[in-house]
């Protein structure tokens, strides 16, 4: 029982179920029901064999035996729930619990033999259900052999009563400790979380008692578009008295008009479905609150994403993309900062957020023994899809990800690409308001990848999609705005075209000259574009030599009319020895590499400055 519950935690299955709308009390109710069926089966088998075989101690007091066995079985269910809170690894839980079962059985027997043969156990011993059960079996065997003294009858009543008390203690302890214990995956509650309804009532429906968030700790090298986005979110936060939006979906922030074209939201009528304000995540290297080995995964991320938008979050490995999504989806608790999704505060209203959330995690989280259809049906029910629409919804999802022919196959028998499509289908099921897609097309072939792009594009209207990917082509094709992260910070922000113009190396004209006519071709291009810059001497190809000229930018760009340039090239290219030519715009890959390299240089500079500071401190000492 314990191992299965821990396995769901370890493999993030429980976390994904929560993200898809499962309330924890329903989760524990399902665990109790399933484990109760298992223990009831074994208990009934034990009773049938014992009573049918006329075992002496069972035949003498059958009613007491049945009550003892069933109460003990039920107490073990709640004890298993409590024990599962303290484990993160399935193997460890199995080994430790197997050992503890033996210890409890031996301890109860040894205590009875050594000291309590003819007198009652102290009642507090029975807070441990296995000890109470062991003692109860001893008393029953003693009754069968020598009769039941009055102290033994009273002790048996105490045992039965304490087993009931144990169930209550174990249940509430499990629910409370599970809520407040720090989790490997998921956000724990504060110790007094159960007083939240009282606080809400006293504060007139609001839980937000924090002071306005600080605007400090701004990167001195922050990009202008990132600064505009931060100021936009600050304006919204200041308008609400220093708190993120919370309370209901209708309270999501309205986007004021932005003067920065291509970077922040452009329409004053659209809602921000995601507001992230100074979000920060630090992985501690030790037990102390701060140490030199701390790793800052996300550094003061301030961002707003609106409805009807597919936002691309790019960056090299370790940039903080997946960590940011993990915080937004409640998988990791932020070290500091605030965020709201669909108008609900991430710190206090995650249950409401989960009802409106769809998640495709970076790595597939699936039950290998379920079929594709069963998996989608399960999550459709979690999302509250009406019963009469379940079959229709599942069939639509199967068609969308092209898995209709494999719907009866178990997940464990699918290829990695097919499992990825199942994860994408799960994120889209139930019509969520905001969808997080963490590298959704990893491992897919080109044709399937294009189909998934179409599916994601169709899902964009009336909702917000946050996409991370290492494919610049995918980001270009799907995303209205793109943000690039490096070393935990948001380095740039804007539409694909805006970023290409701002960080790209300018438009380029590639032209191929016939062998021996390279200089004539270059002279022709220089005549047509006097302010252009030839990039290199040329690259030898099979049919000639390819050269590249960078077109002028800024004020000089106005002197180059592309329509006239194309007409002149059509007229003069052949006479100048130019075989073919093509205009090439900056790619997102160029922008990505430029941002990544600049961030590396900046990071090396910071490390060098830190080293110099340490050296000066050592010299001063």
Regions found by a protein language model. Name each.
Residues 329, 337-345, 352-353, 357:
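Conserved ABC transporter NBD signature motif
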Residues 435-438, 444:
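Catalytic Walker B motif of ABC-type/P-loop ATPase nucleotide-binding domains
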Residues 377, 381, 389-406:
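Conserved ABC ATPase "signature" region
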């Amino acid at each position: 029982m314990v191992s299965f519950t821990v396995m769901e935690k370890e493999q993030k299955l429980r976390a994904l179920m929560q993200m898809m709308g499962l309330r924890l009390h329903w989760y524990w109710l399902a665990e109790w029901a399933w484990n109760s069926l298992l223990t009831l089966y074994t208990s009934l088998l034990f009773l049938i064999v014992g009573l049918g075989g006329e075992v002496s101690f069972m035949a003498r007091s059958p009613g007491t035996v049945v009550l003892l066995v069933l109460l003990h079985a039920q107490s073990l269910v709640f004890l298993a729930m409590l024990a599962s809170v303290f484990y993160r690894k399935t193997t460890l839980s199995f080994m430790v619990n197997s050992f503890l079962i033996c210890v409890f059985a031996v301890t109860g027997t040894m205590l009875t033999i050594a000291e309590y043969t003819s007198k009652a156990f102290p009642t507090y011993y029975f807070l441990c259900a296995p000890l109470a059960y062991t003692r109860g079996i001893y008393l029953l065997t003693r009754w069968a052999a020598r009769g039941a003294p009055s102290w033994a009858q009273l002790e048996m009543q105490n045992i039965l009563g304490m087993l009931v008390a144990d169930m209550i203690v174990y249940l509430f302890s499990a629910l409370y400790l599970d809520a407040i214990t720090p989790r490997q995956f998921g956000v724990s509650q504060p110790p007094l979380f159960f007083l939240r309804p009282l606080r809400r009532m006293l504060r007139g429906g609001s839980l937000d008692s924090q002071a306005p968030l600080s605007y400090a700790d701004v990167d001195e090298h922050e990009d202008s578009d990132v600064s505009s986005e931060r100021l936009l979110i600050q304006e919204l936060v200041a308008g609400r008295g220093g708190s993120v939006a919370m309370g209901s979906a209708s309270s999501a922030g309205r986007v004021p008009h932005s003067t920065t074209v291509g970077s922040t939201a452009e329409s004053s009528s659209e809602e921000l479905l995601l507001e992230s304000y100074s979000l920060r995540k630090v992985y501690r290297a030790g037990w102390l609150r701060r140490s030199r080995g701390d790793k800052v995964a996300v550094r003061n991320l301030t961002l707003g994403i609106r409805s009807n938008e597919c936002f691309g979050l790019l960056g090299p490995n370790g940039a903080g993309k997946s960590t940011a999504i993990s915080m937004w989806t409640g998988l990791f608790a932020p070290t500091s900062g605030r965020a709201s999704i669909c108008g609900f505060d991430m710190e206090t209203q995650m249950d409401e957020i989960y009802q409106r959330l769809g998640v495709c995690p970076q790595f597939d989280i699936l039950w290998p023994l379920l079929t594709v259809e069963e998996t989608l049906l399960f999550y459709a029910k979690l999302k509250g899809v009406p019963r009469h629409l379940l079959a229709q919804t599942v069939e639509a999802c199967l068609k969308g990800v092209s898995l209709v022919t494999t719907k009866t196959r178990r997940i464990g028998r699918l290829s990695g690409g097919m499992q990825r499509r199942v994860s994408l289908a799960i994120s889209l099921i139930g019509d969520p308001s905001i969808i997080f897609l963490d590298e959704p097309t990893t491992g897919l072939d080109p044709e399937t990848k294009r189909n998934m792009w179409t599916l994601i594009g169709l899902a964009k209207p009336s909702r917000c999609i946050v996409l991370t990917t290492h494919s610049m082509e995918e980001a270009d094709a799907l995303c209205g705005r793109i943000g690039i992260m490096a070393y935990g910070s948001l380095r740039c922000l804007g539409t694909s075209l805006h970023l290409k113009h701002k960080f790209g190396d300018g438009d380029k004209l590639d032209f191929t000259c016939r062998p021996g006519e390279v200089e004539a071709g270059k002279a022709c291009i220089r005549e047509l574009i006097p302010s252009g810059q030839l990039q290199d001497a040329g690259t030898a190809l099979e049919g000639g030599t390819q050269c590249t000229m960078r077109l002028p930018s800024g004020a000089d760009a106005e002197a180059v009319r592309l329509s006239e340039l194309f007409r002149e090239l059509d007229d003069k290219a052949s006479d100048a020895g130019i075989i073919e030519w093509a205009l090439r715009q900056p790619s997102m890959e160029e922008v990505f590499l430029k941002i990544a390299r600049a961030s590396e240089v900046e990071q090396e500079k910071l490390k060098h400055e830190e080293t110099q500071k340490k050296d000066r401190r050592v010299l001063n000492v």
